[in-house]
């Protein structure tokens, strides 16, 4: 269920990447682009944290920022093992 929800949330991002973004010149100052960052963050971290990371990234992407390489942060290790692992 979780993977399906993640894919559903990423669907509008993919629509933007393939249908809307090609109509405009490249403007993102970061690598990967903000849309690619959003899709990767949601798939890697889940919907809530992924959208939070994406929102922070989009707010940082403006004409006065330096830009550059800004990858999605790695998933932090779990502090406690889940009950299913025992």
From Swiss-Prot:
Disordered as annotated region, ranges: 66-86
Superkingdom of origin organism:
Bacteria
Keyword hit for Transcription regulation: no
Which keywords fit this entry according to its UniProt record? Cell inner membrane, Cell membrane, Membrane
Cellular localization per UniProt: Cell inner membrane
As for membrane topology, the entry says: Peripheral membrane protein
Q: Which GO terms describe its cellular component?
A: plasma membrane
Q: What does this protein do?
A: Could be involved in insertion of integral membrane proteins into the membrane.
Q: Which family does it belong to?
A: Belongs to the UPF0161 family.
- Alphabetized PANTHER family for the sequence: MEMBRANE PROTEIN INSERTION EFFICIENCY FACTOR-RELATED (PTHR33383:SF1)
Q: What is this protein called?
A: Putative membrane protein insertion efficiency factor
Organism, by scientific name, is: Nitratidesulfovibrio vulgaris (strain ATCC 29579 / DSM 644 / CCUG 34227 / NCIMB 8303 / VKM B-1760 / Hildenborough)
- Give the taxonomic lineage as stored in the record: Bacteria, Pseudomonadati, Thermodesulfobacteriota, Desulfovibrionia, Desulfovibrionales
């Amino acid at each position: 269920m979780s993977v399906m929800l993640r894919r559903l949330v990423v669907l509008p991002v993919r629509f933007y990447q393939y249908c809307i973004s090609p109509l405009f010149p490249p403007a993102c100052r970061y690598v990967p682009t903000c849309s690619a960052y959003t899709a990767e963050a949601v798939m890697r971290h889940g919907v809530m944290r992924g959208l939070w990371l994406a929102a922070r990234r989009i707010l940082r992407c403006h004409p006065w920022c330096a830009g550059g390489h800004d990858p999605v942060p790695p998933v932090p290790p779990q502090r406690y093992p889940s009950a299913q692992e025992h």
